[in-house]
């Protein structure tokens, strides 16, 4: 089931598990391996050739009253990095980064 990519993300030093069309958030301290089809990576090791326009398919359990609400352990660049760099790490072209505040990311 496809959902619009619209959620609040908080900066973190933890990593997440990502596949091209699916996202599973996991805790770095978790002992559980990623589900089949997912591979774990650090946000500091994103390949430069990554296609940042991929679509996300979220688990229906993240749906709440018709709105998607989820917390992602996403590592964002600090304020010294350019907005374009922030967008690449966030995986979108419309990211807004404010220190100590949630980041709103909308799929364009």
Curated annotation (Swiss-Prot):
<protein>
    <recommendedName>
        <fullName>Putative uncharacterized protein CCDC28A-AS1</fullName>
    </recommendedName>
</protein>
